[in-house]
Amino acid sequence: MKRIFCLLLLLFLLPLPCARGEAAGEDPVVSQARQSVVHLYGMGTDPETGRRSRWTGTGFAVGIAGEESDIYLTNWHVATGSGKYADGQVELWLLLDDAQFDSRHRPAEGSAVKCRVLITTDGYPDVALIQALSPEGSRKALPLRPSGEVPKGTAVTALGFPGLDATRQGADSGPEDLWVSSGIVREHLAMHSAGDSRTIIHTAAIRRGFSGGPLLDSQGAVVAQNTYGFEADVSTELFCALYIDYGMELLDRLNLPYTRLDSSEDTPSWFAGLLHGHGLPPGAAWTLLILDAGAILLVGLGLFKAARQLPVKIPGGGNKGGGIP
C-alpha cells in the first residue's frame, strides 16, 4: 500500500519550482504577505544523554489583519521538536534577518527573538500557537479563510523558508529571503495516516523548512498550513496543507482575536481584508472586487475543465505522517 511520509523522507534534493527572493513584478498580495512570515529555529536537549538536536520551520502572524502581532501559527512539530523532549528541554527562536550562530549553534545576540509556546494540538493535526517575547518579533497579521470554502481549481501560493542546511553559515531570514511557489487546489482530503486530519492537496511546491508556513489565496488570506508531502513513488507534484480551521480553533480556545474572511458573506471584515491585501482606498477596492470576481469566474471555468481530465487519486493508510522541521 502506498504510504504518506513526512517531508523529511521526501526527495527534496530534486529541483522544485520554488522562487527565492522577491521577483520583479511580483503580485502585491505576495509582497505584502512576506512581511508577515517568519523563520523559526528550535533546539532540543535529551535530558539523559545531553545530546542536542536542531530544526527549522516557518510561521506567520495572526490577529487583526494588518495590525502588528506577536502571535504566530506554526506546526506542532516545529514548536516542540515533534514532541520528543520533556517540558523545559526545548528552546524556540524567531530568526531575524542575517541571523548568526555561536559555536554551540545557538542564535547570537541580536540575531533572534525568543518564543514561547502558548498552545498546541499535542500531535495531530500538528498545529501550534507561539508568541514572540520581545517587540522585534512582531509582524503584521494575515487574515484567515476557512479551508472548506476553497474550491478545487483555486489559485494558491505557498511561502516558506529553507531548511536546516541553510543555517550552517548563518541564516537569511528576512522577507526578501522567503521561497515562494504557486499552484492550484486539486482536492480536499482527510489524511488517514495523520490522524484523519483535514487537508488541502495542492500543486504549489513546498520543500524542507516550509513546515508551518501559509498557503494563500489570491486575496492574501491564509487558507491552509503547509505541512506534508507525499512519498516520491506516489507524487512529487502534489503537496499537502492542513486546514487553517485547526489554527482558528486554537485561537478561539485562548480567546485571541483574529480576522476571519468568509467567502459566503459580504462582511466588513471581508472587505477590510481586501483593503489590507491590496493596499487600496475603499473606492478602488470595490472596483478591484468586481474585476476579481469576473476574472475568477473565467479562470475557474478553465481549471474545472482541466481538472476533469486529470483526476487525482491519493491512497491513504501506511505509516503515520509528520512534517519535517
Summary of predicted features, one role per range:
Residues 67-122:
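Catalytic-histidine neighborhood of serine endopeptidases
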Residues 31-48, 156:
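A short, Trp-centered hydrophobic/proline-enriched beta-strand micro-motif
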